[in-house]
Design a protein with these regions (language model features):
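Cytosolic-side transmembrane-helix boundaries in multi-pass membrane proteins
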Residues: 146, 153-160, 226-284
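Membrane-water interface segments at the C-terminal ends of transmembrane alpha-helices
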Residues: 7-11, 53-79, 125-128, 162, ...
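Cytoplasmic-side transmembrane-helix entry/capping segments in multi-pass membrane proteins
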Residues: 1-2, 50-58, 192
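Transmembrane alpha-helical segments in multi-pass inner-membrane proteins
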Residues: 28-30, 167-247
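Helix-loop-helix "hairpin" substructures at the membrane interface of multi-pass membrane proteins
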Residues: 34-36, 110-187, 211-212, 216, ...
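Membrane-interface helix caps of multi-pass small-molecule transporters
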Residues: 9, 13, 36-47, 69-70, ...
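Membrane-embedded helix boundary and interhelical linker motif in transport proteins
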Residues: 1-39, 69
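Transmembrane helix-bundle core of multi-pass membrane transporters
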Residues: 56-134, 241, 276-282
């Protein structure tokens, strides 16, 4: 959401800039907005101990409210409209279309709706893979994620790594919103995003949190979502069945971890029971 708002703020201004300057500037502004917004939960975690999951959920609501304010139409009581509101849209809360110089060009036009943002996403995947698995920073990120205490003992600055990681994650989320806005919608409206963020969590889990695995999982979920409406129209099958399929896929992926956890608990219980019996036998 923040990436979309920041990119649109640049895209609807600076008319006359060439695309080679305007488009990268809009993309970078979206990533910067996402990075700042994502770094805040990391900063709160290392300074106050606030749980990052709870804080990020709260930040989601704040981002939605802030974005809604930027395109607020003003209402019927003469309230001041938002700074990005399209004055020609009357009572509709949305921004104007970004200038053509800030739009990501189509790769395949309608009905396919495929644009060059696909390549930006693939480049981001490769960069993340290289950063996480081929650099010292990536090693520190993985170490802090697996065992913060061991990372601190090894001399890694845990606080700095946490803030950096959250900021990078925010930048990637901002890039996703930017690509969606500049490539497809060309404007921002309050209903932007929907469940995309939560779908991203599901896709990451399905892809085993590996950059290349996420690509495969995202294509699977994207194909299911894209075919849902057509399936309902042509075959009469409810589109909600797609959500059921996605939930089942995730359940099957998580099943091995659940089974391992159950067996681990059972083994711990058996060992504790055996220890109790041995102690009782020895004491008698």
């Amino acid at each position: 959401v923040m990436g979309s708002v920041c990119s649109v703020a640049i895209g609807i201004h600076f008319e006359g800039l060439p695309m080679i300057i305007h488009l990268p500037l809009a993309i970078l502004s979206g990533m910067l907005g996402g990075m700042i917004w994502g770094a805040i939960p990391g900063l709160l975690k290392v300074t106050t101990g606030a749980h990052e999951v709870i804080v990020t959920i709260m930040m989601n609501y704040l981002a939605s409210l802030f974005a809604g304010w930027t395109v607020y139409a003003g209402g019927t009581q003469g309230q001041t409209p938002g700074p990005l509101w399209d004055r020609t849209a009357r009572a509709i809360s949305e921004t104007p279309d970004v200038f053509e110089s800030a739009q990501i060009p189509w790769l395949f036009g309608p009905p396919y709706r495929v644009h060059y943002g696909v390549f930006l996403a693939l480049i981001a995947v490769f960069i993340v893979w290289w950063l996480i698995y081929k650099t010292t920073i990536g090693f520190e990120i993985r170490t802090v994620g697996q065992n913060p205490k061991a990372a601190r003992y090894a001399g890694i600055r845990v606080e700095k790594t946490v803030v950096l990681t959250m900021g990078l994650a925010g930048a990637l989320a901002g890039l996703a919103g930017t690509i969606e806005t500049l490539g497809l919608n060309h404007k921002f409206a309050p209903e932007f995003g929907g469940q995309v963020g939560f779908d991203g969590i599901t896709v990451a889990l399905l892809g085993q949190t590996h950059p290349f695995g996420v690509v495969i999982a995202s294509f699977l979920f994207g194909a299911l979502d894209a075919g849902a409406a057509k399936m309902q129209f042509e075959s009469g099958v409810a589109a909600d069945i797609i959500q059921v399929i996605q939930a089942l896929v995730l359940a099957f992926v998580a099943a091995p971890l659940i089974i391992k956890a159950l067996f681990r608990l059972r083994s711990s219980g058996d060992e504790g029971h055996a220890t109790k019996l041995n102690t009782s036998w020895g004491g008698s």
